[in-house]
Amino acid sequence: MTIIRKKHPLIKIINHSFIDLPTPSNISSWWNFGSLLGLCLIIQILTGLFLAMHYTSDTATAFSSVAHICRDVNYGWLIRYMHANGASMFFICLFLHVGRGIYYGSYNMIETWNMGIILLFAVMATAFMGYVLPWGQMSFWGATVITNLLSAIPYIGTTLVEWIWGGFSVDKATLTRFFAFHFILPFIITALVLVHLLFLHETGSNNPTGLNSDADKIPFHPYYTIKDFLGVLILLMAFMILTLFFPDILGDPDNYTPANPLNTPPHIKPEWYFLFAYAILRSIPNKLGGVLALILSILILALMPFLHTSKQRTLTFRPITQTMYWILVADLLILTWVGGQPVEHPFIIIGQTASIAYFTIIVILMPMAGMIENNILDLD
């Protein structure tokens, strides 16, 4: 078996990636999320495939087809709720994975990090288009509001929006193309994941100390396969509790009402995992400014390698920057909460303050804290 594992042209690629991969001996459970994201992607592709067998991407029948899946298809309700809540689990793992990358300075592996940012954008685009497909009230109005943001682009904005819509409003053409894109994107994401792993295996994994671990590597299997398996069990446990006991807790009740272009819901808001970005978008009164802030809220991650001022890679031994990091986490939770609130006092000012704090912490305070720590430790 060893000979096949190491010699076979196809199997040896898997061997070098998941079995004999030299891995730092001290990586913690925070390094589990890569494999958990892979599991989430597989779950989403499989459940999505079975949903696509019964779904119809037509404005007249889309809502009914989803109801039909839940009522008449064998275990259709389970497949539908696994797919909907699988997206939430996906984003929880994504945010924790990115948070780990920021905390332990993994952004210094620039190619892997940039690939991860592209993946994040791709997953967000996929989730947004998936939310439109059930053709409920929030699907329709969410699609209308978010696509309309492109009209803020000077000169070509309006033309671009109508081109994406395939008409003068969100209608049948929009739904059909969103379904097509929603179907193809996960496979593109899978390809990008392989590139992400390729870049990662060029440099090897980071570790909690941020030090070079070449002298202390162990094989991925059995040590980290068993460790990842524990993470898988915990994720599946949480996932099934969410799906079977509280399937609608993260959804919007408005989406159980069929889409009606003549009736605007009182509060249009996206799914919970977009609320932090939505809060940043809403905090700027100018339309174009809001759109730019929205894009920058994610794109700012690409600046992280260039904003790294410390002589140490991770935050493990850097209490000042650690404090800034956890304030940033709290700030993101505040933004997520505010994004789901109506646009009125005091939520407007809270959102604006939290948005300013978000960019200030990343661009100014964390780099400054890094320099202060260098001075304290005489690392200059």
Curated annotation (Swiss-Prot):
The cytochrome bc1 complex contains 11 subunits: 3 respiratory subunits (MT-CYB, CYC1 and UQCRFS1), 2 core proteins (UQCRC1 and UQCRC2) and 6 low-molecular weight proteins (UQCRH/QCR6, UQCRB/QCR7, UQCRQ/QCR8, UQCR10/QCR9, UQCR11/QCR10 and a cleavage product of UQCRFS1). This cytochrome bc1 complex then forms a dimer. Keywords: Electron transport, Heme, Iron, Membrane, Metal-binding, Mitochondrion, Mitochondrion inner membrane, Respiratory chain, Transmembrane, Transmembrane helix, Transport, Ubiquinone. PANTHER family: CYTOCHROME B. Its cofactor is heme b. Component of the ubiquinol-cytochrome c reductase complex (complex III or cytochrome b-c1 complex) that is part of the mitochondrial respiratory chain. The b-c1 complex mediates electron transfer from ubiquinol to cytochrome c. Contributes to the generation of a proton gradient across the mitochondrial membrane that is then used for ATP synthesis. This is Cytochrome b. One of its GO terms (cellular component) is respiratory chain complex III. CDD domains: cytochrome_b_C, Cytochrome_b_N. Belongs to the cytochrome b family. GO terms for biological process: mitochondrial electron transport, ubiquinol to cytochrome c. A ubiquinone binds at H201. Heme b b566 binds at H97, H196. The lineage of its organism: Eukaryota, Metazoa, Chordata, Craniata, Vertebrata. It is found in: Mitochondrion inner membrane. Heme b b562 binds at H83, H182. Binds 2 heme b groups non-covalently. Heme 1 (or BL or b562) is low-potential and absorbs at about 562 nm, and heme 2 (or BH or b566) is high-potential and absorbs at about 566 nm.
